[in-house]
């Protein structure tokens, strides 16, 4: 069974911003970030419950997170019956849980 992954608009902007920043730091690094993100998303698609559960969100919502290999980012996502919703592609040390309200929208 293939699970559809969709992104909230804010998460798309976060991906774009991070990839651009890395690309400006070193040529090719933005593409490396996107490749690592793709691997994390494929892991989520194959095994939606692989990520660790996130505390401090509504108890009836299954919000999980998976790290982006080689980069200080993680994918925060909501597991639902029919699909997965990426809530954030967030930096590990900046603005903790700023995205948590997105799970309840």
Feature-to-residue mapping (PLM):
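Short, hydrophobic secondary-structure boundary micro-motifs
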Residues: 31, 52-55, 98
